[in-house]
Amino acid sequence: MKEIGALQAEYPLVNKLIATEEVFWINPHIEKYERAIKDSPLNEENVKDAEERLKRFAPYIAKVFPETKGTNGIIESPLVKISSMKEALETTYKQPISGELLLKCDSHLPISGSIKARGGIYEVLKYAEQLALQHGMLTEEDDYSILDSDTCREFFAKHSIAVGSTGNLGLSIGIMSANLGFNVTVHMSADAKEWKKDLLRSKGVNVIEYEDDYSKAVEEGRRQADADPSCYFVDDENSHDLFLGYAVAASRLQKQLEELEVVVDKDHPLFVYLPCGVGGGPGGVAFGLKLLYKDNVHCFFAEPTHSPCMLLGLMTGLHDKIAVQDIGIDNVTDADGLAVGRPSGFVGKTMEPFLSGNYTVSDEELYRLLKELADTENIYLEPSALAGMIGPVKVCKEDEYLQKQQLTEKVKKGTHIVWGTGGSMVPKDVMNEYYRKGLELTV
């Protein structure tokens, strides 16, 4: 890897990253959709396959998780207009936001209350299906609710699943795996919140805690799983299945936009702002959206100033060969879901030609935005889930991207979607504490 001095000379923005200042980065490697998709390791067929699998599992999900009965076992979240929050943002940052502002409430996804309910649950279901098909317990034509039986649970109990997580991925994989009957172990990094560990233990999940950061928890989890032939490791850094589970969100969002009569075409651009940790969740969602809307959707990743791993990897082209700690950043943030020092190389390389840009936001800003959203819309998110909220302000303020893409006028007829990644499962006392911090920082 290059010396820090060489990186600073070649990429002046590195200096601001080191100083943990907020930055806005436009991706110089973005390509037109038709060109980018040609070299992509994944395609529309892969996403459709994931979508079909989730439909097959819908009867099982509806039976085992009553909260999904209303959607017939499809795990989906609301898309809501947040006009009052938009006004508050414009007033606070003295910056008009051209276009409509919507919030995708993955914070309120059933089962595990975060975006990770998409990829995490999907990968566990895919593995369960594979085992059940191999052992003649299921055919693809069956009603999958038959998996909710003592026989199936006893069968799955002979197998184990492991994952490394800062919290939310562990919740979705732990809850789903335990329900099916698997023995499940979640390796949790130092920044994982106590309530998330407690919730997992209450579901019968084995939680192993580490004093190190996320990368160490994943590494240990992978090592222990490798030593056990009956253990399946969900690899958050490299998993195509997780990525595809997230990508399914796009076609669901498309239907919701149509219901709200929101048009997306070359004259009505769509901007999407996604909090980013290791990259799988935002990468998968953005990839799915690109497949549908091609050059008419513009996706931005949002990271904490103390954990800008994806921005660093993309900007330098080093991807997972560089960690924020290599340039002296501590990777300590209250945005626990985004506290990742080294990005996924698979996601970075896959998304490089599709991603519009990346920006960072301070913890203090996240708390202020948390309070503002609660006050204006009565929606409570966890700190990491607010990273996308400042995106529309940044894109409209730093209008270089809009100019480059010839969107300065079109943005007025466009739509901004902030992806709210988690929060509904946060205990009330913890959420009150978050709100109090936001209040202190606002006064």
UniProtKB/Swiss-Prot annotation:
GO terms for molecular function: D-serine ammonia-lyase activity; hydro-lyase activity; pyridoxal phosphate binding. The modification N6-(pyridoxal phosphate)lysine is found at residue 116. Transmembrane segments: none annotated. It comes from the Bacteria. It catalyses: D-serine = pyruvate + NH4(+). Its EC number is 4.3.1.18. One of its GO terms (biological process) is D-serine catabolic process. Its cofactor is pyridoxal 5'-phosphate. Keywords: Lyase, Pyridoxal phosphate. InterPro entries: D_Ser_am_lyase, Ser/Thr_Dehydratase, Ser/Thr_deHydtase_PyrdxlP-BS, TrpB-like_PALP, TrpB-like_PALP_sf. NCBIfam families: D_Ser_am_lyase (TIGR02035), PRK02991.1 (NF002823). Belongs to the serine/threonine dehydratase family. DsdA subfamily. This is Probable D-serine dehydratase. It comes from Bacillus cereus (strain B4264). The gene is dsdA.
